[in-house]
Every structure is written in C-alpha cells, then in structure tokens.
Amino acid sequence: VSVVRGVGLGLRWEFLDDLVQQTDNAGDSPNARGAGALPIDFLEVSPENYMKRGGRYPAALAWLAERYPIVTHGLTMSLGGTDSLDAEYLRELAATIRAVRSPWHSDHLCFSVASGRVLHDLLPVAFKEASVQPIADRIKAARDALGVPMAIENVSYYWHPGRAEMSEAEFLARVCEAADCGLMLDVNNAYVNSLNFGFDVDRWMADAPLERVVQMHVAGHEWFAVDDRGIGRPVAPGSAGGMVIDTHGADVPDPVLTLLARVVKRTGPVPIVLERDQNVPELAALLDEMARIRATVA
C-alpha cells in the first residue's frame, strides 16, 4: 500500500471516524480495495497531529495505513529558521514515517521557530542568495535523519522580510538545486500570493523548478476586508482593498483549478492533494470535490 499517485485527501480529524467507517463498509483490506471502495487514491497526513499521542486517533491512522497509501507532510520543521533542528522531533517523525511507509516527506520553506519559541505560523524567508545554502543544508540534514527524500512547499505569505534579491520561484529553484530535493507545489498558495502582490502567476510557474515537483496541493481561499485595524469581515472575491487569505476554508475555486490544469500539462501526472482545514464539510462533499480535480487533470 505504498504507491502514491492520483488524487488524495489531506486527513483531518473532522472526518476521520467517517472515513474509517466507510472504508470498513466497503470491505477494504490490507491486500485489496473492496468493491465499494472510496475514490481516494491516497491520504496525506501531518505526523505532528499523531506523534506522542495515544488513543483512537493514532490507532485509526495505523488502521488506515494498512488500506491506503500514505504520504507525510510536516508543519513545524522550520527549514528556513536558524535554530538547530530538533533531534527528538526528527526521531519521532522518522518513526511515524516508517510506520505509515511514506515514500517521501514534505515541509514548508519557511521559519516557524525563533530563539526556541514556536511561532504557530509559517513565515516567509528572505529570498536572498545568502539564505540558499544554509536552508539547503538543513533540508539535507532532515533527509538524512528521516531516511526518505525531502520536498519543500511554497507558502502563502502576507508580508515579506527585507529586500528580495530574486523572485520566490527563482529562490525555490536555487534551494531545490542546492539541496537536491523535490518541490511540493502548492498551486493555491502561488495563486493567492499573485493576487495579493500583483505578479503574473504563469510567469511564476515558468520560473519555478517544475521538473522537481513530486506532489501538489490545491485548496480554497477567501477574501477579507482590510483597514487600519487589520483584517476584517469576509468580502466578495475581487473586492477593492480586499486581501486574499489562504484559509483552506472553501471549495477550490475555478481559477485555481484552471491554473492546476496548465501546470499539469508541464509536469505530467503527479500526486495531487485536496486540503481542507476550515468549514470542513461532510466526507461526501470532499469526495465530490476530488472528482472535480480528477476531471480537471484528466
């Protein structure tokens, strides 16, 4: 159960029990999918949600790992930070990766830890030449500790530290080359950033190292009003003065699916994950959305 391909679903607790029940009802076993198997090609799991945790969630993950291919996607490695990588975290992460038999591990090209403090956010790094090799060295150290190939994800951001020496896409290419790692391309993140910062997302894709893409993410986003007090109420898409937030709280919009189709023409078939973290609907609705994604890249 280790081939990761097609269209997968980011596993979330909101529908975990339903997924287990429906998978069991379909008669799926460790060796064969049942006649009524769910149209889920694989699952993506964030190990931090299961590490050092007892009870039904890790047990459910172990059960699902015998029935679906699983790939892991991290949240807290802080590859763009300067704090030392957490050795205990890497040991726990490696054990989880082995347990679910993930063929690679991805995490975000960002910093989320500073001076030992977890920032609970995925903050952008400076797109400077001096940052390339230190980040690449951290990616290679993580790869060696985990025992599987690494891939880095482009993040959404709403501010940027310092003056950039290159575009984000060029920076991703430099880091991937220096680290000899894969790219976990988040199509929605690139689209959201293009709206907020006014750049051409197709040019961004032309500069990105698409030859290194091993996996993609798609998700929904939402528009919010912005004023002197900060981010306010939701507004209609395209509203003047609005900001687009990568909430993972809505269906994947048509422009993101259209962009996905253009990108897949260049990359060829790669595993695609649907992410949903806010306003999570019933599993049936997520399966319908996955069908839209399949139709888009068919």
Where do the model's predicted regions map?
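Boundary/entry segment of secreted carbohydrate-active catalytic domains
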Residues: 1-23
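Acidic-and-aromatic substrate-binding clefts and catalytic sites of carbohydrate-active enzymes
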Residues: 16-17, 46-57, 78-88, 158-165, ...
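Distinct, well-ordered alpha-helical segments
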Residues: 18-23, 161-177, 193-206, 284-287
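Acidic (Asp/Glu)-rich catalytic clusters
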Residues: 21-26, 36-38, 54-72, 88-103, ...
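Conserved, mostly hydrophobic/aromatic
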Residues: 43, 105, 186, 216, ...
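Gly/Pro-rich active-site loop or hairpin
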Residues: 54, 69, 84, 122-128, ...
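Active-site acidic/histidine proton-transfer and metal-coordination neighborhood
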Residues: 86-183
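C-terminal helical cap(s) of enzyme catalytic domains, especially alpha/beta-barrels
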Residues: 283-298
